[in-house]
Amino acid sequence: MVIFKTVNDVRSQVKEWKKQGLKVGLVPTMGYLHEGHESLIRKASKENDKVVVSIFVNPTQFGKNEDLGSYPRDLERDIEVCTRGRATAIFNPEVEEMYCDNASTFVNITGLTEGLCGASRPIHFRGVCTVVSKLFNIIPADRAYFGEKDAQQLAVIKRMVRDLNIDIDVVGCPIIREEDGLAKSSRNTYLSLEERSSATILNKSLTLAKEALNNGERDSLKIIEIISKNINTCNLAKIDYVEVVDSLSLQRVNYIEKSVLVAIAVFIGKTRLIDNFTFELQ
């Protein structure tokens, strides 16, 4: 496992692999890797000759009162996960390597970023798109892998790649869950034992919504009500949003006639967790 710290070094290596006709996969992460990340790395290693995992806590996607300073970091643990997943290399730059002094160029996408997480985190996706576009430029991979837990992020990145004619395939990968249904997340480490137990309310509430949809319910407000009512039975839970949106446009729908994304964001104590599922009409 080789660890690159500079743009020039990782770019040179990837270009050399490409000259040899090798396929390269990229797994962009902020580190503190878990089984969800490992599943992305494993998929990338099966579909490519070489895999680069980027580990970079990107400051431009955090708001003023968010958890940039406390975001968990453990490079040794990350190296172990990358090794198990059969990654070839890690790109672990410092902030100064990724952003020069007085950097003034950012990538901003309208429409898709305005609802869901974008409503309460207004600068988040500008930071995400900027750093991901930089990574795509630094590491000219054939494919990039992202988890479907961050469904809005996945949709936004796919749109950015389409709109900017970036030559890379964006691959979405299924949500990986704990045994009790909680979606794997680096932020789960913030939860106390009581909060961790309460956090299962997210998946339980989505499961109730899924059952209602499978039984024929098509009114989005009814689905939102089912989820919200169940979440509100948990004293430690505070809803940020519960939405039913078109899977492609991420616009709210009133009546479900095609594929929709059912997405939620909930504070358990001070920790903000997200989860979702996609419902496909048969």
Curated annotation (Swiss-Prot):
Localization of this protein: Cytoplasm
GO MF term (any one): ATP binding
CDD domains linked to this entry: PanC (cd00560)
Entry-linked SUPFAM superfamilies: Nucleotidylyl transferase
Keywords: ATP-binding, Cytoplasm, Ligase, Nucleotide-binding, Pantothenate biosynthesis
The protein's enzyme class: ligase
Annotated binding of (R)-pantoate, by residue: 61, 153
Residues given in the record as ATP binding sites: 30-37, 147-150, 176, 184-187
A cellular component term, taken from the record's GO annotations: cytosol
EC numbers: 6.3.2.1
Pathway: Cofactor biosynthesis; (R)-pantothenate biosynthesis; (R)-pantothenate from (R)-pantoate and beta-alanine: step 1/1
GO terms (BP aspect): pantothenate biosynthetic process
Matching InterPro entries: Cyt_trans-like, Pantoate_ligase, Pantoate_ligase_C, Rossmann-like_a/b/a_fold
Protein family according to the UniProt entry: Belongs to the pantothenate synthetase family.
Task of the protein: Catalyzes the condensation of pantoate with beta-alanine in an ATP-dependent reaction via a pantoyl-adenylate intermediate.
Description of how the protein assembles with itself and partners: Homodimer.
Other remarks on this protein: The reaction proceeds by a bi uni uni bi ping pong mechanism.
Name listed for the protein in its UniProt record: Pantothenate synthetase
Organism, scientific name: Enterococcus faecalis (strain ATCC 700802 / V583)
